[in-house]
């Protein structure tokens, strides 16, 4: 009888240990995924505001705002001019990449042209654009994700920060801890 209780106890202990290890392993994977979430967000080829292919290498050393937006989105239409002004004030060390949510590449091109967006864009509805949206868990637009010069996500609250802090948003991003 004692032996069967001991075996039962050992069995429960073994199952518990496996469960704890499994949960710990899953949490570590989630943590690793969060740390590397910026990897692969920006493809090597982007479009300039004329629709011509350009290298994303020109973003090197800059803070980048991934701007999730679309021509049919009222709040986007109101925020886009604010973002254009912000970008112009900080063009030396800040760039925007549009991740459009329009139905076709032609619709996105019209949107870029109408608002005279001076920045780069991902190809509309491309695999890269969809992956960035999924990886960053975009739930609504306008949505502005800020990457530091190393490509690390430092803020998913860019719209609010640009609106409330105005020109001071750049200083806030620069002062964010590098290991956060």
Q: Which residues make up each language-model segment?
A:
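Conserved redox-active cysteine motifs that mediate thiol-disulfide chemistry
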Residues: 68-85
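N-terminal targeting signals for export/organelle localization
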Residues: 1-45, 180
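Thioredoxin-like thiol-disulfide oxidoreductase module
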Residues: 103-140, 145-150
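Sec-exported extracytoplasmic/periplasmic mature domains
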Residues: 78, 85-91, 113-117, 149-152
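Thiol-/selenol-based redox modules, centered on thioredoxin-like
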Residues: 146-180
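Short pre-active-site segment immediately N-terminal to redox-active cysteine/selenocysteine motifs
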Residues: 62-64, 69-72, 140
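A short beta-strand-turn-helix
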Residues: 43-64
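Short beta-strand segments
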Residues: 97-99
């Amino acid at each position: 009888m004692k032996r069967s209780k001991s075996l039962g106890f050992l069995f429960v202990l073994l199952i518990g240990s496996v469960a704890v290890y499994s949960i710990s392993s899953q949490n570590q994977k989630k943590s690793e995924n969060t740390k590397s979430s910026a990897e692969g967000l920006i493809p090597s080829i982007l479009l300039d505001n004329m629709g011509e292919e350009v290298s994303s290498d020109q973003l090197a050393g800059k803070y980048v705002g991934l701007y999730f937006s679309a021509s049919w989105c009222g709040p986007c239409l109101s925020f886009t001019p604010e973002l254009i002004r912000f970008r112009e004030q900080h063009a030396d060390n800040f760039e925007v990449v549009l991740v459009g949510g329009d139905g076709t590449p032609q619709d996105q091109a019209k949107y870029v042209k109408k608002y005279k967006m001076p920045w780069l864009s991902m190809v509309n509805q491309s695999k890269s654009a969809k992956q960035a949206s999924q990886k960053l868990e975009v739930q609504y637009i306008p949505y502005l994700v800020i990457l530091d010069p190393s490509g690390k996500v430092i803020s998913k609250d860019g719209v609010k920060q640009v609106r409330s802090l105005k020109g001071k948003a750049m200083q806030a991003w620069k002062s964010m801890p590098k290991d956060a």
